[in-house]
């Protein structure tokens, strides 16, 4: 598909440690951020949240625990999704687990600020251990007007006929930061020559734009293209789910 046709973000995630090559051929990805109900926020006098303070103010405004209404559906369970969600806020505050020299930098002021904010924000989410199902359900049934979730919420939003009413915000403090991941095709070491040839042929086949298009359209909106050629294909552009979200897929 040509190296230059892949988005830089996808290439960076599969780049080798020395930066000289790649460890996989990207095929799709997904991005996590803050999804919000445009109508509810607008009716309450809020525009798209642009920073931590905006997110907190909106979450506070909509929280009415007596009536089981909450400002934001966010991960609180001990697990991967909570790690992913918190990492966005840490990165947006300039905090990271490792510095440029590979030294551990967990116990820093920036990291403590991010943790404090995440703890504060969690006051305005549903009680208990919230994970993938609880977060998605709360946003989809109107319990919360904001949710920290991946692009895999979009197929459900489409099915609910609410595509035009969803917005996407990026947690921002010192920087903009989202959590995302890329699925890549790899070829194992230790294969015999025939196996290696077959693996290379299959990787080349799936890396053709038309086949990558079919791959991401197995979950339109959820799986995101990592190759610029895919978004120019008629099948992708004319997909009913993709079309329903207008400019949102290209913004993501």
Describe the function of each predicted region.
Residues 1-31, 56, 166-169, 235, ...:
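Hinge/lid segment of periplasmic solute-binding proteins
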Residues 1-6, 39-50, 145-146, 156, ...:
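Extracytoplasmic "Venus flytrap"/periplasmic binding protein-like
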Residues 1-6, 76-77, 93-113, 159-160, ...:
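Short, solvent-exposed loop/beta-turn-alpha elements that line the ligand-binding surface or hinge
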Residues 8-50, 75-100, 179-188:
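Periplasmic solute-binding protein
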Residues 23-24, 64-78, 138, 208-219:
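Bilobed periplasmic-binding protein-like "clamshell/Venus-flytrap" ligand-binding domains
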Residues 58-62, 100-129:
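Glycine-centered hinge/linker elements that transmit conformational signals in sensory
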Residues 84-85, 116-198:
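Extracytoplasmic/periplasmic substrate-binding proteins
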Residues 153-163, 174-252:
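C-terminal lobe and pocket-closing loops
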